[in-house]
């Protein structure tokens, strides 16, 4: 039977991608249905209890700048906040927070249940309704059919998921949840390339059985960082420390002596695991010269006794897991409450997607999260928001939108996936972005909030706060530009006390702030320049914009040069065999990838600058050279 009301957008899966997709589509005014196999696990943290980190924190800030949910949720659920790379430049500084799993899930569910235009329904999906290469609905396990103009697949590790502990394995979407086997079979019938990946998680430890007195503590930062541009440290719950222990030679001997019982090393697991989050077995074998690895003992929540030992993800048998855990300092009497495991699952080649995350072959079908070959809550959330907003635009018969590489880490993520694809779980790093000085955490709102407002994602409150911040930055920069200190003035002595070399000529506030030894905080305590901004976000922007002005201008020039290639469009229907002068390899790759622009074509492995030149000349001769606005 069909459900009585049709929907504009259906989201399948309620993890980090699905919840952002549902919120985005609903915020844009589309009637949205979120289908999940269990309402109680909406926003569930399946692996580590943390949000953010290098590259990942940048994505969270971008999701927030576009009106998304993740940053707000972690501000309400974070039990330890830190700035990573705090001593380095602003481009690579990143926020990270430990999370209380229960509080995080509550924050997500509360937001979903209070979002207008969004209905949540508990049923697993077993089939898609596809008519004339266009998706028009979904079918649940009890045969109930829902119609929609667009469908977003955010199914995580559930597609034909198989859990491995030692040489034993069983079907599962994650520990305690069933897999999605009928939907996996249905998707394999569609003209989409599919492969297998694997990821893993460590055993969870009972905190009451750990001797924390012999372990080093790691505390959060003070003052506490905040994730959301709309957030406040007052929203954070009670803060707690993490603890640090290490593996040792005994640990490594246990692992080496039991590799024949590892499903990875015994050839039972075929899927490729995440390079940047390897299992402890992989770390011991790949870094054989190291006699220890640092392990962070992270609390899972304020009301839980479970500890997440970050760094010992494993699929070894349970008895070996016990030996590994008890070989480490402070853990000699530890008890495991949940075993570690590896999980294999289906993923679909993201090169079969448009930059909007819509399938090139099935109209109205969007993919986001681990189904696209990524790993991590943050990567999933960012894709979910993009897929959700584009599903909403598709439903409303509007053109899709995707950020550029110079505009957002989300742009880098999507371009990497759709252009290059991936053979292993893809994780975001700042090093993946060629314009990372422009793509900082601190300016995510300046880069994206205006765009989010145009798309219908940003509400009035966020828009007003954003404009206040812009005005504060502009006013303060004008004030510093127009306030001068003369070397002969009485106030010069006060200023010179903070400088490595005294003033030799008249200097403005901006001139002084450009000096490496002068911070904004110091500057506004000097009598000519007091008082400063109370808004810490705006003050940070003023300092960064002034200190890095030359570098930022140089990078902007590079972006403008590259933009010429990005704006040169390639016809979707072009058969590259028509282009004389291209090698067979280049023709095959271009026909396979079907890049949307010259810029995207230039990033495909094996496409040479010479091939790009030939293509540009041919397009011009054919009168097919088109540039986007």
UniProtKB/Swiss-Prot annotation:
Coiled coil: none annotated. One of its GO terms (biological process) is tRNA wobble uridine modification. FAD binds at residues 13-18, 125, 180, 370. One of its GO terms (molecular function) is flavin adenine dinucleotide binding. NCBIfam families: mnmG_gidA. Homodimer. Heterotetramer of two MnmE and two MnmG subunits. Belongs to the MnmG family. This is tRNA uridine 5-carboxymethylaminomethyl modification enzyme MnmG. It comes from Klebsiella pneumoniae subsp. pneumoniae (strain ATCC 700721 / MGH 78578).
